[in-house]
Regions:
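Beta-strand/loop substructures that line and gate deep hydrophobic ligand-binding cavities in soluble
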Residues: 79-105
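Conserved active-site and cofactor/substrate-binding residues in soluble primary-metabolism enzymes
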Residues: 14, 35, 111, 115
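Terminal, regulation- and interaction-focused segments at domain boundaries
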Residues: 1-26, 125
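Compact, glycine-rich, soluble single-domain proteins
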Residues: 29, 35-81
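Short glycine-enriched loop/turn motifs at secondary-structure junctions
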Residues: 1-2, 24, 46-49, 85
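Well-ordered alpha/beta subsegment
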Residues: 103-128
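Short glycine-/small-residue-rich flexible loop motifs, especially phosphate/cofactor-binding loops
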Residues: 20, 37-38, 121
């Protein structure tokens, strides 16, 4: 699987408030927020569950990745998804950077991805 998943007891709105704080505790900031529900309604006229994609960045790791390989920017930021499950509880998913970086074949980026994965895993573990 190319991501890590955690089902929460929290509602979607509660999770949206908590996820940035959990990410911040591991040195990430949320750079972008894409409202998929709103975008699909506006562009296609279709209804979709509440679903947001947060673009999370850990500046020291991003800088080191870019210093290693400028093409690493294609893999940034780390996407974190928050959506409303069928039971109205929130589900949070985070990209597994080791999976996306594997395609580069760059061992230095692989090491960085392992460290970022650990931080994302810890951030998810803070959520309930």
């Amino acid at each position: 699987m190319f991501g890590m998943r955690k089902s929460l007891r929290a509602t979607y709105d509660e999770a949206l408030a908590r996820v940035p704080e959990a990410l911040k505790s591991e040195g990430f900031g949320v750079l972008t927020e894409i409202d998929i529900q709103s975008t699909l309604k506006q562009k296609l006229g279709v209804d979709f569950r509440r679903y947001k994609i947060l673009g999370a960045c850990n500046p020291p790791f991003a800088h080191e990745a870019l210093e290693t390989d400028l093409a690493a920017g294609l893999l940034l930021p780390c996407n974190v998804v928050v959506y409303e499950g069928d039971d109205r509880r929130a589900v949070v998913m985070a990209v597994d950077p080791t999976q996306t970086v594997a395609a580069t074949g760059n061992p230095k980026l692989g090491e960085l991805a392992e460290a970022v994965k650990e931080k994302l895993t810890r951030a998810l573990s803070r959520l309930e």
